[in-house]
Amino acid sequence: MTKKQQSFFAIASILLILFLDQWVKIWVKTSFSPYQTVALIQGFIELHFIENRGMAFGTEFGAGIWAKYALSVFRLLAIIGIGYYLRKVILTQNPNFSFLLAIVLIFSGAAGNLIDGMFYDFAFDLDKDFLTNWTRTYDENNAVFLPDEVRKTGFMLGSVVDMFRFTVTWPSWMPFGLGGGEIFPPIWNIADFSISCGVGLLLLKYRKNFGKSNDEKPLEN
């Protein structure tokens, strides 16, 4: 592809992934009740609506406002760095399609989850049913309320919406306590899937090139 075609592909792919990611998240958030589950393919994958304060696949990064700020700033810096690298690769090199696609997938996924944290607190009201990973406090009527220091809302403080979950389980005869348990229990979204595919593509296709300088050998296709 020419540089113009590469630029068009990168921009169009990023916009498409971001659109799909945000469309699914907003649809689930406005249509599902907290923790509501709907089977997509029985025994394989389902929709299960949750929100998380952490990283990809619901991984936690501390349990407070400063941890959330740190994670959001890290995401922002990572996106800026990846975006700068993507632009540099297109303008100064001739990346093959697989490498370009991998960087686009990683950038799109990181940007998709950052959008949640940046803007969702402005677009949606805080749902107190999603405080399971934060401190729950109860008033005299046994109703949940949230002290300011536990869950502040605002720019960079929104939760990430997750919804996809594989329901495939290990055979009952599996050792080490795996029998009957889910093979992949984390709940994820399109942004997480995009990042995982991008990283996986890099590892599969370019692992032999890691650690080599750019002038030693071009990336293999």
Language model features: what each stretch is:
Residues 1-221:
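Alpha-helical transmembrane bundles and membrane-interface segments of multipass inner-membrane proteins
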